[in-house]
Swiss-Prot record:
Gene3D superfamilies in alphabetical order: 1.20.59.20, HUPs
Signal sequence range: none
Family that this chain belongs to: Belongs to the tRNA(Ile)-lysidine synthase family.
Protein name per its UniProtKB record: tRNA(Ile)-lysidine synthase
Domain comment as written in the entry: The N-terminal region contains the highly conserved SGGXDS motif, predicted to be a P-loop motif involved in ATP binding.
Binding sites annotated in the UniProt record for ATP: 34-39
Catalyzed reactions: cytidine(34) in tRNA(Ile2) + L-lysine + ATP = lysidine(34) in tRNA(Ile2) + AMP + diphosphate + H(+)
Record localization: Cytoplasm
Length: 325
């Protein structure tokens, strides 16, 4: 399909072209297509810019008629010039709420179907701003407000500098009517309320430009965080001895570096749901040691939880019987 040279679709195409040149020069990509405006504009641009595009349409099967919506999206992808389009039905189950369960099921399906291709996602600057706000609400340190990166293998996000309104304009220029997912308007979901209530209020009170400022903040923190991560990798190589942390060696590092080392070490040991409070308590075992007891962290078994103990100047992760708590 030959795309019209209209302002919005050209901007989306330029964003996709830059991403392909930087991350997929062979031009072999997959696109996650929901049928909504963001992914539809992305798919149209990708089909015009890439050598070969495989459209992947996830059917979450959460609403009546979802199979028809998925089939229509796949047909549109083929009409736009995608080499192939595949519908991926999934079962949405698991803990953490419907939003999280659907996301996990979607990413598993996309990863399984992509082969060796990177998968382009339709996240926009507005999505980035919402992600940074969600991270701020958790208060889990700088990493939680990094936002999303343009390429986190295998996930590509070419539209992080493009506003959501522009993808809608691009669809209008193409004569395409995007699918409107009812879940995207439901106040039951935190991200929807951020989009429809919080961000518009911030834009109004602060005089505009909030979404862009949030996205830039996330990008700056991500760049600085990459430097700290490199420093932490070096510190970890020195401080981890036989799977344990040498507290004297780790104490030589600055607090942000120490916490990165501890986070990496704990996750490798099997910690789950690691929060800032737990991480700082473990850091206290290194830098503010006063003989305090063990620190409980997430993970373990049904009968025993993971704990961190300090013994003879080293930290180790062990199990503690939950039934004694």
């Amino acid at each position: 399909m030959v795309l019209p040279e209209e302002p919005a679709i050209l901007e989306v195409r330029h964003a996709v072209r830059r991403w392909i040149a930087a991350h997929a020069p062979d031009g072999e990509i997959a696109v996650a297509l929901s049928g909504g405006a963001d992914s539809l504009a992305l798919t149209a641009a990708a089909a015009a810019e890439a050598r070969s595009v495989c459209a992947l349409v996830v059917d979450h099967r959460l609403q009546p008629g979802s199979a028809d919506v998925a089939d229509e999206a796949a047909a549109r992808a083929r009409a736009l010039g995608c080499a192939s389009a595949e519908v991926l039905p999934v079962d949405v189950t698991g803990s953490g709420g419907l939003e999280a369960a659907a996301r996990q099921a979607r990413y598993r399906a996309l990863d399984s179907a992509r082969g060796t291709r990177p998968v382009l996602l339709g996240h926009t600057l507005d999505d980035q701003a919402e992600t940074v706000l969600l991270g701020l609400s958790r208060g889990s340190g700088g990493r939680s407000i990094w936002g999303m990166s343009a390429y986190d293998t295998p996930w590509g996000r070419p539209l992080l500098d493009v506003r959501r309104a522009l993808t809608r304009q691009a669809c209008a220029e193409l004569g395409l009517s995007p699918h409107e997912d009812p879940h995207n308007a439901s106040p039951d979901f935190v991200r929807v309320r951020l989009r429809t209530e919080v961000l518009p209020l911030l834009e109004d009170v602060l005089g505009g430009g909030v979404a862009g400022a949030l996205a830039r903040t996330g990008e700056h923190l991500r760049e600085e965080g990459a430097v700290l991560d490199a420093m932490a990798a070096d510190a970890q190589a020195k401080a981890v001895v036989e799977g344990e942390i040498d507290t004297a060696l780790l104490a030589l590092s600055a607090p942000p570096v120490r916490r990165r080392v501890l986070r990496s070490w704990l996750l490798a040991a099997g910690a789950r749901g690691l929060g800032d409070t737990q991480l700082r308590a473990v850091d206290d075992l290194v830098a503010r040691w006063r003989g305090q007891g063990q620190v409980a962290i997430g993970g373990g078994t049904p009968d025993a939880r993971f704990v961190v103990r300090r013994r003879r100047g080293r930290l180790n992760v062990g199990l503690d019987d939950r039934r004694r708590v």
